[in-house]
C-alpha cells in the first residue's frame, strides 16, 4: 500500500477536500492523512481477504471503504488492487541468481482517502493511475504516486448546488458531482444497484430492518458491492440517517465485530456466511449475490421484522417496477459512440436521471409512511404524541410503527421536524399536500375527517380491496428458499397500466448540471507551478463570472465560493472573506461558516487593519465570532406526551393542553380551565385531566369512525365534517341521530340510512329548550325554528337536551358573528368551543356539568351581552377577514402586508401562479395566503428573528423584506425560501420602494433609521448609489419627479439623487407644538399634494407641492386617537388608526376623497389598532391589526 506517506514537502493539499483549518500550512503530521484515519487498520482493509501471492497475474479490482472515528465522523476510501511480478536480485532458482521469480505476482494496493464519498470519481482517478504504475519500474512508482496525490489534493470539492467540477486525469475526464443542497448527501454512485440485486419486496424488507435498527450483516463475494449497496440503502432513507456503527467491509481479522450487542450495519465476504450465521445470534443476514434475506439460527423461530404499511408498500413496488433499470435497453436505438468522452457523458446523464427517479420513489415511500407525524407534534413545547399517532394507523401497521418510533433514527427525524427543517422530506410533503390539508393545517378545530377525506377513504379502500383480489400482497417476512435470482427476470418495463397515477414513478427530468473545468496542473510538486495553477484558477473563475447573466446568482455563488477557496490557498485572506461575504447576497445556504471563522481567527494584524476599512466585512466578522453563543442556546430535545401526575395551576394546565394537541388558543384554554374548576379550588387534579383527555380522544375517535353513506355525503360540502352525533332520538322528522357539522344540522335516519336536513346555522331563527309530555313523563325537548320552514323542528333528546341546546346556540351565534363580520374563523372557534363543552360534560358527569360547560359558550354570551352587527358602511365595504395567527397560542400583530399579482412563470407550478398576500407577523414570521381564495398558501417561515418593517416585490421572482435587525432578506417566490441577504445597512431597515408603474423595476431604494439611503440593482444586488442624510430618524421614502422624498420625523426632506438637499419641510415651521413628529406621508402627483400625519394629532395635513412654505390644509378625523399608516388608492387616501367605534376603542380606517378633502367613510372592523395597509391592484385594500386581534381585513376599493 503506497499512498500514505508521513513526510511531505509541500503544503497540505488535502485542505481542499475537507476545507479544514486556516489557510496557513498546518503541522506536517496533519498533512499526511485526514484526521481520524486509523493507519494500523487501513492495510488490512486494503486487503480485506488477506495478502496472497499469485502464480499468475490477476485482474485489477477496486473496492470502497467507509472509515468512522470515535466521534462518528466518516471518511471514505477507494482502494485499487493490482499485481506486479516479483523482482528480486536475491531470488535464487536452480542454484543461480535470477532478477525475476518465475510465476510469482505480488498484490499492491493504492488507497485514496477523502472526506467525501466520491466513489465513481476516485475509481476513475485510480484507474488512470494504475495505467501508469503497471508498466513502470519499481523506483518510478513512488514519484508517480506522489505526483498523483499532489494533483488530487489541489482539486477542490464543489459547493452544494448545480455546479459540477471537471478535470483531466491522463486518458479520462473526471467529473466531481456536487451535493444537491447543503443538507443532502453527495451521490457519486449508481443507486439502482440494489434494485438489480433484490426484488422490490426484499428492498422494502431491508429498509424495514434498517428503520427498526436491527443488527444487519450484508454478504457478497464482491468486496466492492458491499459498500456500494449499503450506501445505496443509506441514500434511500435520506433524510433519516443511520446512527449506529456502519462498517460495510470487515476484513477477515475483524469478524468478531459481528458479536457486538448493539445495532450495527456491517459487511462480510460471502465465504464467512455460514460461520457468522452459526456463531452470532439475532442477526439479519442479507446475501447480495442471491438477493435473499435470512436470520441467524437462534432467531428463526422468533423473527420480529414487521411489514411496511400496506398501501405505501404497494405503491413503492409499482413505482419500482415501472423504472427503466438497464442502460442497454435505453441505448439500444443509439449508434455506438466513437468518442470515449461523449459515451461516458451519455451514460452519466442516464444514470443521473435514474438516480433522481429512485430518490423520488424512496422519498415518496418515506413521506407516505411518516407524513402524518406532523399532525401530532407540538412545536412550542417540542412534544410528540406517539400514542395518538399510533391510534391513527391501521391495526396491521402498529407493529411497524411501534418499533420504528423507538429508534434513534426516528428521534433524530423528529428533531428535524420540530426545528421545521426544510429538507427533502419536508419539501416533498409540501409539494404533494392537498389543498384540503393545507387549509386544515391552519384550522383551530380538532381533527375530524371532511366529506372529501371520507370519500377518498372509501375509494382507496375499494382500490386496496381490488388490489388484494387481483394480486396478493406478499408477506415481507417470507424468506422461503431457494429463490430465483432477480437478475433472471424480464429486463423490460413492467406493465403498470393498471396502477398508473399515484403509483407510477414520477417522470422526473433533472436539470442538466453546469460544469466548470479546472485548469491543468502540470507539475503539482513544484511550488511555482502550484502558484501558477492558483492564479490561473482565479483568472478562469473571474472570467466565468463576467460572462454570467446578471440574474444568475445561483451560479455566481458557486464561482464566488470556489474563488474564495483558491484565495485562501494563496494566503489572500481578505479577498477570500470578501468573496465569502458576497454569498450572503447570492446564496447564503452555502456560506462556509466554520471555514470563515477559522480564517478570521488566523488573521494577522495587517489583515485586521485591512478588514477594518470595510465596515460590511467587519460586521460579518463580528456576526461569525458571536454565532457559537447563539448555537449553544439551541434547544433540540424531544418529549413524548405524558399525562400529568401533579395538580395544575392555570399556567401548567395551559402547557399540558397545548402539548396534548387538543387546542392551542390561550383564551380558549383559559375558559376551559374555568369550566373544569367551577365551584372548587382553581387547580386541576391529574385524574380530572386524564378523564377530560380520554373523553376528548374518544369522541375524536368516534368521529373518525362515523360511516356516512354516499347518499348522505352527496348533500354535504366537501370540506364539511361531522363533529357530533346524538344517540338515536325521536323527532318530528322521524327516528334517527342528529348530526352536527360546522355548517348545518341534519338527521341521519335509521333503518334505511338517509339524509333529512334540519337547518343550516345561518337559517336558524330560534333555539329553545322545552319539555313534552309522554305517558305522564316530561321529556326534555329541543325546538329549532328555521327561517325557511313553517314547521318547528322538535327532538326528544332527553338527557342530552341541555348539552345540545348549548352547542346549537353556540354554533348559531358563531355563524351569525362570522356572517356579520365576514370572518369564517369565528365558525372554527365556535366549533372548538362546542366540542370542548361535550368533553367537559363527559368528564364531570355531575349535576353541575352543564353549568360548567356553559363557561365555554363564548359567542352565545357575546351575542346576548352586546350587539355585534357592524355599521352599514363597514358591512358594504368589507369583503372578507382572515386570521394569519390561526393555530398560534396568542394573536400576533400584523406588522406589514404585501400583495403580489399572479404570474404564469415557467418556474412556478400552475396552481401556485395565483396572486399572493404576504403577512409579516411578529419576530420575523411571514405567512403567505392565496389571494384568489384567501386560503393558506405557505405556513409561516422566518426571516430573521426581529420585527419586519417593510416589504416590496422587486421583480416577479423575489420579495424583499426589510427588518429591524438591519438586514434585507430576499425571498424566492417559487421556493418560498430565503437564500439571500443584503447587509449593507447598519441600523433598522425602515422602507423599501421601487419606481411606480414599472413591472420589472431595475432598482430598489432602501433606507434605514440612521439616515442611510441605498440604491440597489435588482439583477446584480449591488449598491449603485448611496447617500447619508444629515440627520437620522428616517422612517419612509417616496420617489417623485426625479427626487427622493424622505420622512425623518422632524422634517420631510427632498433629496437630489446625488445626495444633496433640494428642499425641506420642517415640522417646527408649521406647528407650535414641537413635541410632535411626522409619522407617515403620501405624495399625490396628479393633485400636486403632499399628505402627512403627525404623532398625537387626529388630523391629516395637506401641503401643495408648488409651495411647501404655505400653511397646510387640515382634514379632521372624528373620534381618532392615533394615526399609524396611510396609502393612496386611486383618488382616495386610506388612513389606518385607532379610535372610538360604537363607543369602544377599536381600529378605524378613514377613507378620504383626495379631491374634496373630506372623509367619505369610517370603517370599523378591527378590535385593535390598524397597523398596516396595502392595495391589491387598486381593486381591494387590505388592513392588518395589532396583537389584540391580529387579523387581516379585505375591503372593496372604489
UniProtKB/Swiss-Prot annotation:
Sequence segments annotated as region (Linker): 438-888
cDENN domain ranges (all copies): 186-318
GO biological-process terms attached to the record: endosome to lysosome transport; protein catabolic process; regulation of Rab protein signal transduction
Biased composition (Basic residues): 1-10
SMART domains: dDENN, DENN, WD40
UniProt protein name: DENN domain-containing protein 3
GO molecular function: guanyl-nucleotide exchange factor activity
Gene: DENND3
Ranges for domain uDENN: 1-163
Region feature (Disordered): 1-28
Native species: Homo sapiens (Human)
